[in-house]
Amino acid sequence: MSAPPLPLLGQSLAALKDWAVEQGQPAYRGQQLHTWLYHKGIRSLQEVTVFPKAWREALQEYPVGRSQVVQRIESRDGTVKFLLQLADGELIETVGIPTARRLTVCVSSQVGCPMACNFCATGKMGYRRNLKLHEILDQVLTVQEDFGRRVSHVVFMGMGEPLLNRDTVVQAIRSLNQDIGIGQRHITLSTVGVPRQIPWLAQQDLQITLAVSLHAPNQELRQQLIPSAAHYPLDALIQDCRDYMLCSGRRISFEYTLLAGVNDLPIHARQLAHLLRQASQAGARLHVNLIPYNPIAEADYQRPHPTRVAEFVRLLEEHHVQVSVRQTRGLDSNAACGQLRGSFLRASPEPAPGRS
């Protein structure tokens, strides 16, 4: 028997049909496997009861590509955070965020993150490696399995910078759409901005939402918060965003984490409105998503008072900027990106398998 496409998770319907034929099976076995992989969420080929028993036994050593849940924490608002252990022992986080009408998954794209944003728990842990296709898809299947309902929305806002793993992330977006059945317009990719990558993304013919993490209205402050911003001037980033919106026809969401006394003053709101004016005047559609900070032990930043948040909103609206405030979920369960992994490693008496 020839080697299968490994891992199986991440393979397209056509590839699975071809593989089944290579194994001497009818092509419809590949269709069945596709259904069991992406819609039933199997963790072992032994679960595919529609396969002949002899073939199941021959396939028993073939890994599907699922990760192990090593920790699950549910917050009072129903948000569930998962710590997943990959085949090499690395640890990543994913979050399931339910509401009455939707189930959103916040997925990671890297183990750690090289961007080193100084208010972010993931940025404090350093960078280990890019995630593989099956490791991204597995996060969505894990949440579906746990909640017992279909995932409707996916946001690439977990650990890592998606555009530094761009090819695999775009593969994952297409698979989420074609294999799992999540509409591209229900998928959001968040980036702090990587030179030349937003223009590249604009050429990929996707219908996703792009969320750009600004976090500051001027270059000096942005470099203090996001060291990598030194290599991507704010004016150039905004220009690339404007071109992306005009090319794709899709609205961009500008993410802005409010840090008490750091970037939440009235002058910052006015600077932000002025910064975005150059994009909106060109006919581009944009939206600002304000995120009151979720404090972490590794950084000395605080959450702003609600009255400060309300004033920031008022000033942006006064300058005709569309704005909303994100409802922060999972505050009681270390739901900020990177917190669960960090606390788990600190509490572990020995390193996770595969780690030095």
UniProtKB/Swiss-Prot annotation:
Its main location: cytoplasm. [4Fe-4S] cluster binds at C113, C117, C120. Disulfide bonds join C106-C337. Its EC number is 2.1.1.192. GO terms for biological process: rRNA base methylation; tRNA methylation. It comes from the Bacteria. Residues 99-332 form the Radical SAM core domain. The keyword Disulfide bond applies. One of its GO terms (cellular component) is cytoplasm. Keywords: 4Fe-4S, Cytoplasm, Disulfide bond, Iron, Iron-sulfur, Metal-binding, Methyltransferase, rRNA processing, S-adenosyl-L-methionine, Transferase, tRNA processing. SUPFAM superfamilies: Radical SAM enzymes. Transmembrane segments: none annotated. Its cofactor is [4Fe-4S] cluster. It catalyses: adenosine(2503) in 23S rRNA + 2 reduced [2Fe-2S]-[ferredoxin] + 2 S-adenosyl-L-methionine = 2-methyladenosine(2503) in 23S rRNA + 5'-deoxyadenosine + L-methionine + 2 oxidized [2Fe-2S]-[ferredoxin] + S-adenosyl-L-homocysteine; adenosine(37) in tRNA + 2 reduced [2Fe-2S]-[ferredoxin] + 2 S-adenosyl-L-methionine = 2-methyladenosine(37) in tRNA + 5'-deoxyadenosine + L-methionine + 2 oxidized [2Fe-2S]-[ferredoxin] + S-adenosyl-L-homocysteine. It is an enzyme of class 2 (transferase). PANTHER family: 23S RRNA METHYLTRANSFERASE, RADICAL SAM CORE DOMAIN-CONTAINING PROTEIN. Belongs to the radical SAM superfamily. RlmN family. This is Probable dual-specificity RNA methyltransferase RlmN. It comes from Synechococcus sp. (strain JA-3-3Ab) (Cyanobacteria bacterium Yellowstone A-Prime). The gene is rlmN.
